[in-house]
A protein has these predicted regions:
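Nucleotide-sugar-dependent
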Residues: 24, 220, 271-276, 283-303, ...
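Membrane-proximal helix-turn-helix segments that form the acceptor-binding/catalytic region
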Residues: 101-105, 147-167
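Carbohydrate-associated surface elements
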Residues: 173, 187-199
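Conserved donor-binding/catalytic core segment of Leloir-type glycosyltransferases
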Residues: 205-222, 228-232, 359
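Glycosyltransferase donor-sugar binding loop
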Residues: 215, 239-251
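Nucleotide-activated donor-binding/catalytic signature segment of Leloir-type glycosyltransferases, i.e.
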Residues: 250-274
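A charged, aromatic-enriched C-terminal amphipathic alpha-helix characteristic of glycosyltransferases
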Residues: 346-379
Length: 384
């Protein structure tokens, strides 16, 4: 690739989130920052594609994704290729770092700010000497890890906490744990209020009413699969639509798929997600309550408030103190609470009534806060 003209206002984002039709925090904030600053150029480093793993699993779809893709006049996505496991030493990390450095050089990025969400890029970011912001969105120290993975993550995060120009967290729990040794910036999640309140047609793959809808990633550390199965067994007349990527163990996915009234609809384009929530008889949040979920600031909490649909949730962080239309109940009462709401005449009537306005933080507000942090870190890096 021929090096591009030099770009002075630039950002390298090392993210745990893929770049695709499913938009999460980092991707959304990048979109907002680019919209706010007409001079900003971004290199978005998506999770590395593990070549041996994908071949071993026979999954070829990710292998077909372009290594380098221009997705916007000022946004380029790099999908690094990972050929070696980290267990054999630093070679794998060095190979990934070289791919990022080469892409930044080819794009002509000058002294970019490095926004780290994937802590495995800690040594790369700090070795460059470029200003760095560490953005902690989940407490992966509390997730299911092997001892080797946990030790590596602890080392990477300790380096970032000690040497980053700023540390941003998205939840009060993360502010407490990561703020024990240094100052942190709390920037929670948000929502595109206009998108979620603008009426959309009923999605063609949404099952007929009555239907309970869950929107979000199905994940072993946060999704209560037995609770979903309990709901399906107790209410065979209720369709349950699970909208989002499926990262469950294969056995759990198969248990859900085996039930006729449970529909695994997979990931949906971000701009179509509101339609699933707007046409739900009820939105359900069957989350596990554990140390990992206590660290989260669920984006879906903001989306539920914006959409205004009746919602039943387990007492998970981010939902407990929201109030109507969010009904929080313990796990033992979850199925009964869903049944009572579905059977309520007001549930059907409410679908035709616009949601009462609620004050909900927007992604633009969160991006403005993030931009302030980044500008402060940039300024500090050039101060005499």
């Amino acid at each position: 690739m021929t090096p591009a003209p030099k770009v002075a206002s630039s950002l390298i984002v090392c993210s745990l989130e893929p770049w695709g039709s499913v938009r999460r925090r980092i991707r959304i904030l990048v979109d907002e920052l680019v919209d706010m600053d007409p001079d900003l150029h971004v290199l978005y480093v998506a999770p590395a594609i593990d070549i041996p793993f994908e071949l071993r699993k026979g999954r070829l779809s990710d292998l077909r994704l372009p290594r380098h893709e221009q997705v916007h006049p000022r946004v380029h996505v790099l999908r690094p290729r990972k050929w070696l496991p980290r267990s054999i030493g630093p070679f794998a990390d060095h190979a990934l770092s070289r791919q990022v450095s080469r892409a930044a050089h080819d794009l002509g990025l000058i002294d970019p700010l490095v926004w780290i969400n994937d802590a495995s890029y800690a040594e790369y970011a700090l070795s460059t000497g470029w200003p760095t912001v560490y953005d902690v969105t989940d407490d992966w120290l509390l997730a299911q890890n092997t001892p080797r993975q946990l030790a590596r993550l602890r080392a990477d995060e300790a380096l970032l906490l000690a040497r980053s120009g700023a540390v941003v967290v998205c939840s009060p729990a993360l502010a407490r744990t990561r703020g024990e040794s240094r100052a942190v910036e709390l920037i929670p999640n948000g929502v595109d209020v206009d998108l979620f309140r603008t009426p959309q047609p009923r999605p063609t793959d949404l099952p007929a009413s009555p239907v309970a809808v869950y929107v979000g990633t199905l994940h072993e550390d946060r999704t209560d699969v037995p609770l979903i199965l309990d709901l399906a067994e107790a209410r065979p007349d209720l369709q349950i639509a699970l909208v989002g990527p499926d990262h469950l163990a294969r056995s759990d996915s198969e248990r859900l798929a085996a039930v006729a009234t449970i529909h695994l609809l997979g990931p949906q384009p971000y701009d179509q997600v509101p339609g699933f929530m707007q046409h739900a008889d009820i939105v359900v949040i069957p989350h596990l309550v554990n140390p990992f979920t206590e660290s989260l600031d669920p984006i879906k909490a903001y989306e539920c408030l914006a959409a205004g649909r009746p919602t039943v949730t387990t007492p998970v962080a981010g939902f407990r103190d929201l109030g109507p239309p969010i009904d929080v109940c313990d796990r033992d009462g979850f199925v009964a609470a869903v049944a009572a709401l579905v059977d309520s005449p007001a549930c059907a009537d409410d679908r035709d009534t616009p949601p009462a306005p609620r004050e909900v933080a927007t992604w633009r507000q969160r991006a403005q806060a993030m931009n302030q942090v980044m500008q402060r870190v940039r300024a500090a890096s050039v101060a005499p």
